[in-house]
From Swiss-Prot:
PANTHER family: MITOCHONDRIAL RIBOSOME PROTEIN L39/PROLYL-TRNA LIGASE FAMILY MEMBER (PTHR42753), PROLINE--TRNA LIGASE (PTHR42753:SF2). Its EC number is 6.1.1.15. InterPro entries: aa-tRNA-synt_IIb, aa-tRNA-synth_II, aa-tRNA-synth_II/BPL/LPL, Anticodon-bd, Anticodon-bd_dom_sf, Pro-tRNA-ligase_IIa, Pro-tRNA-synth_IIa_bac-type, Pro-tRNA-Synthase_IIa_type1. The gene is proS. One of its GO terms (biological process) is prolyl-tRNA aminoacylation. HAMAP family: Pro_tRNA_synth_type1. Gene3D superfamilies: Anticodon-binding domain, Bira Bifunctional Protein, Domain 2. Homodimer. Keywords: Aminoacyl-tRNA synthetase, ATP-binding, Cytoplasm, Ligase, Nucleotide-binding, Protein biosynthesis. It catalyses: tRNA(Pro) + L-proline + ATP = L-prolyl-tRNA(Pro) + AMP + diphosphate. This is Proline--tRNA ligase. It comes from Clostridium botulinum (strain Alaska E43 / Type E3).
Amino acid sequence: MKMSNMLISTLREVPAEAEIDSHKLMLRSGMIRKMASGIYNYMPLGLKALKKVEDIIREEMNEAGAQEFLASAMIPAELWQSSGRWDAYGAEMFRVKDRNERDFCLGPTHEEVFTDIAKNEIKSYKQLPVNLYQIQTKYRDERRPRFGVMRSREFVMKDAYSFDKDQQGLDLSYNKMYEAYVKIFNRCGLDAKCVEADSGAIGGSNSAEFMVKSEVGEDDIVFCTECDYAANIEKATARLEEEEKEELLEVEKVSTPDSRGIDEVSEVLNISSKKTVKTLLYNVDGKIVAVFVRGDREVNEVKVANASNASGDIEMVSHEEYMNATGCGIGFAGPIGIKADLILVDKEVKNMCNFVTGANETGYHIKNVNYGRDFEGIIGDYRNVVEGEACSICGGKLTISRGTEVGHIFKLGTKYSEAMDAKFIAENGKEAPFIMGCYGIGVTRTMASIIEQHNDESGIVWPLAVAPYHVSVIAVNVKDEEQVKIATKLYEDLKSIGVEALLDDRNERAGVKFKDSEIMGIPMRITVGKKIVDGEVEFKLRTGDMEVVKIEDVCQIVKGEFDKNNLKLR
């Protein structure tokens, strides 16, 4: 591409709306332009980079045996209603009506569509396994779009769905996708970590996320410093502390009139917050769920939702519901005598002795409460782990950092096939539901994450495999016919061996051309200037030093960079 013909407009100033590096640099380099909140146009440079990521995904998915197709972005409500998700999905779904008042949505995800296709097209076990994928634009009405394409309302996603006849087949499909994802992110130059995850609204059993560490990430990721354990905070567990060994004392109601919070109660009673248990009440699908965790812990609402079999989001109870369940004011609730449809007790509480909790009477708490003797419930893990706790696998130290999800793989099982009556004829001649897997990659988010990990003060530093262009050939003085002639010859020679090159033949100062090349992140730069009289040009890697090379050696030097990166020229 000759830059004199290219639609490109770089920005020297950082746009006020941009908060993170990828957003700033995608705007400054001319990759994207904002249309509305969370909605962007991809300019030629941005689209070219996006297609590079898509191509890598497509190659690895095809290599893993998946078949590409393209589903409709507009989905009839009946499909979502058949799975039970039309009402459950919530406000993030863009819902539309046609002229006949039929309900549709702009697809935020495509489980129902793929399941319906399998239901109608796959009749026998002899046609299995099948893995279908697409790369398509999704639509989600994010409450607060931010960080550019990291959290937008319109984004490109690769979603794949596997259909197997049994669990063993699903395990194989899942492992193939895991291996493909590792290859995809490695080829993109992205440092992504696979972590245990919750299945969320999509459902299913086993689930793993591919996360990249990021200070502005929307998830907390828990890592062990000693072993490979890694999990999203929604799923993470820690090693349980040893059970307390104390003589069980008689319960004692004590007056705490002005002490509603854990810290206040601990101070008044002169005890550690670790000797208290707090009560949280939720409304889950119309039922009251009481959760009890140690006083210094935070409840994990995702774990609570899973334990409660919630159909959607859970919410704290209203004041009226709180009063009906406890009979007391805020801050004095406890497990003894509470009126709840479901009682969830964190396993840490089970190991505690003689702890303090609310008395379900305003102004009072109870000392020396013990699980089993004084109250019971469903024991489980309902809290967030904290920095420094012991790893549940090896006992090593857990550390927590922010992360951004770029990929997610699920074992859906029969969640959708049973709900939508999607079946095939099994080997025994009977109907059986498909055993499904689901595998997603946020393509636009992956591209932004690459920029987050690969940039410096001058701009983007694209890994060679995903760079929109590999080489920028710069004619320093376009009024010098010899410079333009040699620059054009190098440009054509590079193209002839499969290198994607830019020829900067604009009538601009050399400094402008250099800055544009750097901010766009072009991996290699060839500067054609006054040294041509000696048969030489300047060669520079984006993050390396400039060196003077012979004109006739340029193509071989560029090819050598591809060899170093284990890349083939097309």
